[in-house]
Amino acid sequence: RRFIFLLVGTLALSLPSHCLVIASGLSSVARGDPALVVDRHDEELTQWIGDHLIDSELILAGPRTGNRLPAYTPARVIYGHPFETPKAAEWRAELVRLFGWDQDPANGLERLRNLGVRYVLYSSEEMAIGSPSWIPELDLVHEVGVGRLYKVPTP
């Protein structure tokens, strides 16, 4: 009898928190929160990358995109899942620095090459970080909506 009382009490106390978690997830999806919902154009661009790029190409992309790309493509990213990226805080800071680059474009391209970056994904997430001076120096490879995939030219 005491067991049943404890079981019912535990269920009664845990049910509201479970409902809150489910409701907040559904609310985020309904609002189109970019942390949970992938834009159709970004999804198409990701599919194109998976279909056309050579395995293990290094891509510079924003934090959310960098978290998703390796899950759907064979590409590698500068900064991906924070718990699976060694020195994640340093790489995220580098990513923000690169997308906010306002110095000489040639120095930015050199930095990308030194890091081994072959492609840059530049879409709404990356645009919100910055408008790097080196973007016009890249070669456009593919475009879907506002999303663009650029190749870092060889010197």
What kind of feature is each model-predicted range?
Residues 3-155:
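Extracytoplasmic
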